[in-house]
């Protein structure tokens, strides 16, 4: 495993002379779909050439101006899954590269669902241009796997996972209904056939869940209904070159650290129909001694989940200049204390 005090560059460029590297055990977290917003990344791209270059690389790889959609919208276009996924990946990688230029580098990486691709770019497992094209296809395949309206997802709050799983099994009635995102002790998202998910949400409320909220999603992610998408994506992923991760990546589907190229590819394939075991992944990193988590990309969803998992850990988000300077100050203070 690389020394956390040695900045690395996935494509071999050395750090700048005198680059300041914070001591301590840092994990970078990368958000998934749903965190997108019009304007994301624009300020950083205007201030940091490496962020602008990242958006330009994405534009070239995709053959259209993704940057324009991210910065100007319209929101309806940015919400299209095959645009949302490369947009969030690009924003996340731009933030990662700015942090790296500042000498703030991770010892571990993890990403929620789509964010796992961002984590692999940060770890040097995947080339950015390969990842951005692949997640465009991933979004398209997921959207096409189930006709609109036939699938659904719901967030169940304040109910233990075992009870949620039991309710899913009861509600299924020969349809698909299963835990899809095990986000925190307080939040499990379920996914499957719309009638089954609706039945499960009602059962959860009857049996004491704090809330059961139907989510405004375009497809039922991370469940067996995504099998057609999984098969199409597997064919794409198997054509890509995966390098051994330069830092371990906590994978969603197993809540284990990926430290080899072949396992990384396999985990991304299985992730399409498998649950995101986020809480377990975070507890794994905590057990490895991670002191500070940085959420690199739009929004603060993962920092919010970390507060539910372990309030004693520091989790900071970076999505614009103000949040970036807050993180820089945090590490500057940490170094001189």
What are these regions (language model features)?
Residues 196-197, 236, 312, 321-337:
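NAD(P)-dependent dehydrogenase/reductase Rossmann-like domain
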Residues 45-46, 170-172, 205-207, 308-311, ...:
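Short, solvent-exposed amphipathic alpha-helical segments in soluble enzyme
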Residues 2-164, 215, 292-326:
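FabD-like malonyl-/acyl-CoA
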């Amino acid at each position: 495993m690389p020394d956390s005090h040695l900045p690395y560059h996935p494509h071999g460029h050395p750090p700048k002379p005198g680059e300041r590297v914070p001591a301590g055990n840092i994990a970078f977290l990368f958000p998934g779909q749903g965190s997108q917003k019009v304007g994301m990344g624009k300020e950083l791209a205007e201030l940091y050439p490496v962020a602008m270059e990242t958006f330009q690389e994405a534009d070239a790889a995709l053959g259209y101006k993704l940057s324009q959609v991210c910065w100007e919208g319209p929101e309806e276009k940015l919400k299209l899954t095959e645009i949302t996924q490369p947009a969030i990946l690009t924003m996340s990688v731009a933030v990662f590269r700015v942090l790296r230029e500042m000498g703030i580098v991770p010892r571990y990486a993890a990403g929620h669902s789509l964010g796992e691709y961002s984590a692999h770019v940060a770890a040097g497992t995947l080339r950015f241009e390969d990842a951005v094209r692949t997640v465009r296809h991933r979004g398209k395949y997921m959207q096409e796997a189930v006709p609109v309206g036939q699938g659904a997802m719901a967030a169940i709050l304040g109910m233990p996972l075992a009870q949620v799983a039991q309710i899913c099994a009861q509600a299924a009635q020969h349809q698909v209904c299963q835990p899809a995102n095990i986000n925190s002790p307080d939040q499990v998202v379920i996914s499957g056939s719309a009638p089954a998910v609706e039945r499960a949400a009602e059962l959860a409320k009857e049996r004491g869940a704090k809330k059961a909220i139907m989510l405004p999603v375009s497809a039922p992610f991370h469940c067996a209904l995504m099998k057609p998408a999984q098969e199409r994506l597997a064919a794409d992923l198997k054509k890509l070159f995966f390098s051994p991760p330069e830092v371990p990546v906590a994978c969603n589907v197993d809540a284990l650290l990926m430290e080899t190229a072949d396992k990384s590819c396999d985990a991304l394939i299985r992730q399409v129909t498998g649950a995101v075991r986020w809480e377990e992944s975070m507890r794994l990193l905590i057990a490895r001694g991670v002191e500070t988590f940085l959420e690199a990309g739009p929004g603060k969803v993962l920092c919010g989940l970390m507060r539910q998992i372990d309030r004693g850990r520091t989790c900071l988000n970076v999505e614009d200049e103000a949040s970036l300077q807050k993180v820089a100050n945090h590490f500057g203070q940490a170094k001189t204390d």
